[in-house]
C-alpha cells in the first residue's frame, strides 16, 4: 500500500511511494528486505477511508480545509441478513435517528431491503459522545430489539458483518477537492 505522497518542486502530486518490505520490528532490514517503489501517475486518486495518513498530509500540505468546518467522525456497524420471504419488501429503505442512544449522543440507523431476501441493517454512532461507557456495538444490538426491526430479522440468518470509522460531518466539512 502507499506510504508516501510524491510531490514535485512545483508542489504537484505525481504519484505515491510504497513502504519498504521485509523490515523487522526493530526497524532493521531482514534478509527479505526490498525497497519500496515509486508509482508515478498523471492522476492519483486517494481513497483510504475516514482519516488516512496520506489524506491528512494532502489536507495539510495543500491547505484543503481552509474555511471548512471541523470534520466529525462516527463508527458504523453493518450486518447483512438473509430473511424470510414474508419479512422482505424488496426496495424498502428505512432510516431512523436517536433510539436507543441517550440525549447528547448522535447517531441513527438504516435498513435496506435488497433482492434475494437480503436485508442490510446498520447503526451509526457519532464519536463525540460524552459518556465513556457508550458501546456502539451494544447500542446496535439493542436497536435490533425494536419491534419494527426485530420483525424483519425474525427467523433470518446473519450472513456477514463489519464495522468501520466514517466521516459524519456535513457538506461544510468536506475538504476542497
Which role does the model predict for each range below?
Residues 151-163:
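A short coil-to-beta-strand element that immediately follows conserved catalytic motifs
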Residues 2-154:
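Predominantly flavin-linked oxidoreductase catalytic cores and closely associated redox partners
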Amino acid at each position: 500500500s502507499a506510504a508516501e505522497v510524491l510531490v514535485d518542486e512545483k508542489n504537484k502530486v505525481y504519484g505515491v511511494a510504497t513502504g519498504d518490505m521485509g523490515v523487522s520490528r526493530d526497524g532493521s532490514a531482514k534478509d527479505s528486505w526490498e525497497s519500496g517503489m515509486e508509482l508515478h501517475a498523471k492522476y492519483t486518486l486517494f481513497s483510504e477511508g475516514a482519516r488516512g495518513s496520506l489524506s491528512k498530509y494532502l489536507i495539510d500540505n495543500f491547505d484543503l480545509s481552509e474555511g471548512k468546518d471541523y470534520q466529525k467522525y462516527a463508527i458504523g456497524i453493518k450486518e447483512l441478513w438473509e430473511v424470510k420471504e414474508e419479512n422482505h419488501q424488496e426496495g424498502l429503505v428505512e432510516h431512523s435517528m436517536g433510539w436507543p442512544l441517550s440525549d447528547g449522543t448522535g447517531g441513527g440507523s438504516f435498513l435496506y431491503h435488497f433482492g434475494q431476501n437480503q436485508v442490510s441493517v446498520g447503526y451509526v454512532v457519532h464519536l463525540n459522545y460524552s459518556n465513556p461507557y457508550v458501546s456502539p456495538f451494544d447500542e446496535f444490538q439493542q436497536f435490533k430489539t425494536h419491534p419494527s426491526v426485530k420483525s424483519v430479522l425474525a427467523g433470518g440468518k446473519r450472513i456477514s458483518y463489519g464495522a468501520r470509522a466514517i466521516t459524519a460531518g456535513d457538506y461544510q466539512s468536506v475538504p476542497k477537492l
